[in-house]
Design a protein with these regions (language model features):
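A structural motif detector for short, solvent-exposed N-terminal "entry" segments of globular domains
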Residues: 27-100, 138-141, 158-163, 186-252, ...
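Middle-to-C-terminal accessory/interaction subdomains
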Residues: 186, 323, 330, 339-347, ...
Length: 809
């Protein structure tokens, strides 16, 4: 063979080889798990169907199974549901599932899914393929699950999205993933599927959880403990049960939280456990130390290490219960709780709340507003503030609203309790310059009785909305009266509490700009300055915030309040001074926070370790000072004393001080700065009251401050800090600017506010002028310097050292 022929043969061979390689690459490309088809779909979870092998899809999964379904080992494992959407049986021999892109994954055994059938796989990490199926991985937030056919192609994928416990991600008929409060493992994602799943949940022991109530405010009064959460257990056997070996808990990690009493439960008999109630020591009641949460909670009944019954407590409406009915498997919601009696009239679900298809809020320069609603079953509505019932008008066409008012709507459907109430506020042609807050109570009569009583300590279900610059929020909450002296005034302070029983455990919204955006409590506050300058409390706290003081301070915004559609004047929406506020400031768990309201109880740990130690020991001795400084944050104490003295708060003697600490932070006591209506009236006077052994606060906080003034380090830190603030953030100019800014913010609203309560706004104008006079003409800054020099007994050289650059004396 000539060299020319050999070259021709070589070229032909290379061409053939290249063609073969190209064909192989083309064949393998769509099947390679290293680059799954439609991988980007994980950003928007949905089942991804390949061109072939798309007969089986992922139809539902749960990444935080706490009390929905147990595997054969008794564990609450994550799970994944597969659905055969074809018209023929499909063998899973050769199919794989993985939680990593490019991984071959866990191999299915030769199991068959019938046409339109479902297969449940536990993602437990146990790696079992005989009998119950368990993958070799578990589910985690922000990962994606891939289902691979025998050819290696990705037939479906689903992204885990960080759902709450016992909430599944379910694939709807239109291919969208949605969170489901009613999981259906092994059944179709529908009401019928959920009912079938529940009917398959039969009790495994003679002692069962029969009924649970997590928001009991007026249904079951238990004597001394009052109204509290409760759990009813029942003996469903025909023999006696000794309870001493059983425990009840809300935690899988601590099943023995509450041991049942050493007593016997006869056949058909029940026992009620009160949860979260204070122990009166009488031994009369069965008291579990833990309380329950209706938005996301689990309950476990155990014997030894074995869980014999469990319940997932999710989305239980206010004053409703959750439990079982005689002769029925699974769980029901009850509109009429029946502690100690047979459960009846239960429904499997709670209807979903109606949806507003148009905007609610503030509308100016309009003739009317159109309201469009949507919902399952029958939607019924009211316009008079009452909660819709089955006899209320049915929504069949858009509603026209032409004046300020409230629209409420509820869904009614067979097989479910009525939905929670949709509350819509319409503030029409009112012309407000401030943000608008709308507070709507569930029952207007009950609210009126509470507000006008006034009945402090009563909490009623309500809804709160904020409308500001075209945005805002609406959230369910509880409302109660707040404060002491203000309760006899025209505008009363109100506390807002977010709870799962109302439909939302916390409010997540950036109300104040920066800082915490999640709230358990808020205040609607008018204060004692409401008939004078209005701004004193907010002026003091705004100066505190802008000076970056090391105290726990409340943020707030001015607003106009409507209550049940009626104008109620100027208020502030603000944070509440409690453990949740300090937890947000310190970045700790609220349960780790201890708050003590002054005056501290005599003989208490705080009193003995802090107040008594300071009073009984010479704090000029560094060792004693350092010991106290290990317990009390000195910067916080100094800043609190400066702010209280600077603002001349004459109401601090009534106990408007709270100490707070957390072992998750520095463990030291910090000081809360709040309730400042009685400020800016008598300049300089409060330093003597706070920091003199003959002052009004001598009984407690003075006992802490006066001994500290004898310590050179504390004295130097205090006076240096005071001089720094008085020369800048607390200068006369800074205070005057703040007064003018707040007065300008309120000026357009004051006339209507004062007229609403039968007064004239000229008194407000006089009070604003009086504030400016005290600060400017009376030289507020100089009055503070003089007061501090007097209290500390400064010599002329010391006075010059600390205040020389700003001292006009």
């Amino acid at each position: 063979m000539s060299s020319k022929e050999r070259k021709i043969i070589l070229i032909i061979a290379l061409i053939v080889a290249a063609a073969v390689i190209a064909a192989v690459c083309i064949y393998m490309s769509p099947a390679s798990p290293a680059s799954p088809a439609e991988e980007t779909a994980a950003a928007s979870p949905a089942a991804v169907q390949a061109d072939t092998d798309s007969s089986v899809i992922i139809s539902e999964f749960m990444e935080k199974n706490r009390a929905v379904l147990r595997d054969e080992d008794g564990d609450f494992s994550d799970w994944i549901e597969l659905h055969n959407i074809s018209g023929k049986a499909v063998s899973l021999d050769g199919w794989r599932i993985s939680d990593e892109s490019g991984d071959l994954g866990w191999a299915f055994p030769d199991v068959t899914i019938e046409p339109d059938g479902y297969l449940l796989v536990f993602a437990s990490g146990k790696d079992k393929s005989g009998g119950e199926l368990h993958t070799d991985f578990s589910l985690s937030e922000d990962e994606t699950v891939y289902l691979l056919s025998p050819s290696g192609s990705v037939t479906a994928q689903a992204a885990c999205g960080g759902t709450d416990a016992d909430v599944s991600m379910a694939l709807s008929n239109d291919g969208e993933w949605t969170q489901s409060l009613y999981p259906t493992p092994g059944y179709e994602n529908s009401t019928a599927g959920y009912n079938a799943f529940q009917e398959a949940l039969s009790p495994v022991d003679a002692l069962i959880i029969n009924e649970v109530m997590v928001a009991n405010t007026k249904t079951y009064y238990s004597g001394t403990p009052g109204y509290c959460d409760w759990v009813e257990l029942k003996n469903i056997s025909d023999t006696d049960i000794s309870l001493s070996s059983y425990c009840l808990s809300d935690s899988l990690k601590d099943l023995g939280k509450y041991s049942l009493p050493d007593s016997v439960l006869a056949p058909g008999e029940t026992i009620i456990i009160l949860c979260g109630a204070d122990d009166d020591g009488s031994g009369t009641y069965n008291l579990a130390s833990f309380s329950l949460d209706s938005s996301c909670e689990q309950l476990y009944l155990s014997r030894g290490e074995e869980i014999i019954d469990y319940a997932s407590l999710r989305d239980i409406p206010y004053e409703c219960s959750f439990g079982r009915m005689d002769g029925e498997n699974g769980w029901f919601y009850f509109a009429n709780p029946s502690p100690g009696e047979a459960n009846a009239g239960g429904e499997r679900r709670v209807s979903a709340k109606p949806v507003n298809l148009t905007a609610d809020g503030v509308f100016d320069d309009v003739d009317s507003v159109t309201v469009e609603l949507s919902g399952t079953g029958t939607v019924r509505y009211t316009l008079d503030g009452s909660t819709p019932t089955e006899s209320s008008p049915e929504y069949t066409a858009p509603i026209t609203v032409d004046s300020t008012g409230i629209v409420k709507a509820v869904c009614f459907e067979d097989g479910a309790l009525p939905s929670r109430t949709l509350v819509l506020s319409y503030i029409i042609n009112e012309g407000h310059s401030l943000p608008v807050v709308s507070l709507v109570s569930e029952d207007t009569t009950e609210f009126s009785q509470m507000y006008n009583g006034p009945a402090k300590g009563v909490e009623l279900p309500a809804s709160i909305s904020l409308y500001r610059d075209g945005s805002g929020f609406t959230a369910p909450c509880g409302v109660s009266l707040n404060g002491e002296t203000s309760l006899v005034m025209s505008k009363k302070n109100m506390s807002l509490r977010f709870r799962g029983s109302y439909g939302q455990e916390t409010l997540q919204y950036d109300i104040f700009g920066g800082g915490a955006t999640e709230f358990t409590n808020l205040l609607l506050r008018a204060g004692q300055d409401q008939e004078q300058a209005i701004i004193r409390n907010e002026l003091s706290q705004s100066l505190c915030e802008k000076a970056d003081m090391d105290v726990v301070n409340q943020r707030s915004i001015f607003c106009v309040l409507y209550v049940n559609g009626e104008y109620s004047g100027i208020y502030t929406l603000k944070e509440k001074a409690n453990k949740y506020l300090y937890a947000a400031v310190a970045g700790v768990d609220p349960d780790s926070v201890e708050v003590i309201e002054a005056p501290a109880e005599y003989g208490s740990e705080f009193y003995n370790q802090v107040i008594q130690f300071a009073y009984m020991n010479d704090l000029s001795i560094d060792e004693n000072y350092e010991h106290l400084a290990s317990l009390v944050d000195m910067d916080s104490l100094i800043d609190w004393l400066i702010m209280e003295g600077f603002c001349a708060n004459t109401d601090v003697t009534s106990g408007n001080l709270r100490y707070c600490r957390s072992d998750q932070a520095d463990g030291k006591w910090h000081f809360m700065f709040y309730d400042l209506d009685a400020t800016f009236a008598t300049p300089g006077s409060m330093y003597a009251n706070l920091m003199s052994e003959y002052g009004l606060e001598h009984i407690q906080v003075s006992s802490l401050a006066v001994p500290l003034m004898q310590n050179a380090e504390f004295k130097g830190r205090f006076l240096t800090r005071a001089a720094e603030l008085l020369s800048d953030k607390l200068s006369n100019e800074a205070v005057i600017n703040e007064i003018n800014a707040m007065a300008e913010e309120l000026s357009a609203e004051v006339d209507r506010d004062f007229a609403r309560y039968g007064s004239d706004s000229s008194s407000w104008e006089w009070n604003i002028e009086q504030l400016l006079y005290l600060v400017d003409d009376c030289d507020w800054c100089q009055q503070n310097i003089d007061a501090l020099c007097f209290v500390f007994g400064l010599s002329s050289s010391e006075r010059s050292h600390y205040f020389g650059s700003i001292d006009g004396a």
